[in-house]
Amino acid sequence: MSNVRYISNLTRETYALILAGGRGSRLHELTDWRAKPALYFGGKFRIIDFPLSNCINSGIRRVGVVTQYKSHSLIRHVMRGWGHFKKELGESVEILPASQRYSENWYQGTADAVFQNIDIIRHELPKYVMVLSGDHVYRMDYAGLLAAHAESGADMTVSCLEVPVAEAAGAFGVMEVDDEMRILGFEEKPKHPKHSPGNPEKCLASMGNYVFNTEFLFEQLKKDAQNANSDRDFGKDIIPSIIEKHKVFAYPFKSAFPNEQAYWRDVGTLDSFWQANMELLSPTPALNLYDAKWPIWTYQEQLPPAKFVFDDDDRRGMAVDSIISGGCIISGATVRRSVLFNEVRVCSYSVVEDSVVLPDVVVLRHCKIKNAIIDRGCIIPEGTVIGYNHDHDRAKGFRVSEKGITLVTRDMLGLPVGYE
């Protein structure tokens, strides 16, 4: 009981700041009109729901969501789905858009995004500040990270995980640690990462999740703001500048529950986004969206159930090994190994296989779609074939990824585009 009370005290003394202003340029047209944290995932969620749910499930009830790039749909989603907290009980989820609070510049980097909200953080009087990445899909108990930070007496703690060296190159901050997990070296997105001791194929990568003692954080941010040569970034500037003179520790990422594999996915490319959604179709997926012990919260639209109609030999409404969300109608069509978000219509004689179909898509009759990502609001013309011939897909103006996933957006179909 004392340990539970100790963790509860730590989480009550913490303010979490989720950095959700990134574009996600490697997702190409999929993020032309939305920030990456606003991107859909798993049939009914958005990426931002995962770090927010981690906060709530970890007992952290004071959260700020920092927004910048094309944030309309993100702000709307957070307001609709996360506005039920009671300020009088010390609970809040606040949206913190770039507003030139300390200069005429917008957020210039991850550190600057926190620096420009120092007054808001200070008003909350936290003992600890947790800075979290808002653009990964993962399940993590932040209370364990907080406890490790407090017990080590660290000034800063960086959450980390082992990734393949080839995957980390140019993509992740990479660190060197001693036997006590104190960080001895840190390099942001190196072309040639240093491998982990005894494992030449793996390296220790930063997850972009940090815990700071509040006053220490403020001191470092103010110093960084006065450095004309700084990129205003935690990985490039703050961490390398403090590891020699201050106590900065690494915290190995682990599952929220014993005997379960930890889940973390970088969905920053079309291929990784498609693959992470496809993994959910397994009978026992690594990310269990049905786990009542660690629910993923989101905005719940009032939608009717999914419906499957027609049972003729040549026109049978059916779905196999798929996730079909509320409001969908499969009308005499076949869906296999696919994720359909809310209010998708698949009309007669069409076949959708191995695809991720975002909300409000209409697939008209006699279409064949496989290995595709169909963006929100697309209307697929009758008889369209997608994913069977990449040269034909490119000729139609669709994008084909490195691993052969075809992306279709409204703009590619000549439909009106803009905020969702």
UniProtKB/Swiss-Prot annotation:
Enzyme class, UniProt record, top EC level: transferase
Binding site for alpha-D-glucose 1-phosphate: 107, 173, 188-189, 206
Pathway(s) served: Glycan biosynthesis; glycogen biosynthesis
Protein EC: 2.7.7.27
Record NCBIfam families: glgC, PRK00725.1, PRK00844.1
Family recorded in the similarity comment: Belongs to the bacterial/plant glucose-1-phosphate adenylyltransferase family.
HAMAP family named among the record's database cross-references: GlgC
Protein name: Glucose-1-phosphate adenylyltransferase
Designated gene of the protein: glgC
